[in-house]
């Protein structure tokens, strides 16, 4: 787990397939105004995934446990790609009201009619191109299952009443902007924004645009409704 920053409201950053390196620029940016907690999902970067940690709900429970151990409340959770699915599940399962805002960046998770998740079938892309390692892909499959989606997720999103920002690369071919629009529309209080010139990894491809959108969403903070 990485922690950065000392003041301001807490932010939990959940990485996607490429691992912690994929969100490192975001962590650095947020650390100037926030306390940032960026855990490594077990199974990435040489970490061991326990056998009973084999689903997205189990991983979300682990991250909620981390927030509890750290005593954090009024938490903004940010997740990208697979991390967005975990972030969504974390918000759904937050029985103690620790989470006040949710940010999804080109997130996967729900089954959306007429849309699909296009997972590359060739060898993993090199890390220099933001690709996940073979170990990361194995962990991803263990958590996400063969379909990389949860058929029961979409109708449950109406219960997440905190403010939600959904950012999407306009050129994403893994999960298209139409997927993102439908994802956002399932939340009661979400806004959807496209990131021009970006594909599935806007944090790597257009970091300044992402940071500007995030800063606008997070500052000034307004009261959240909770759930």
Describe each model-derived feature in a short phrase:
Residues 125-155, 159:
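Hydrophobic, aromatic-rich cap/lid helix
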Residues 171-175:
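Acidic catalytic loop of the alpha/beta-hydrolase fold
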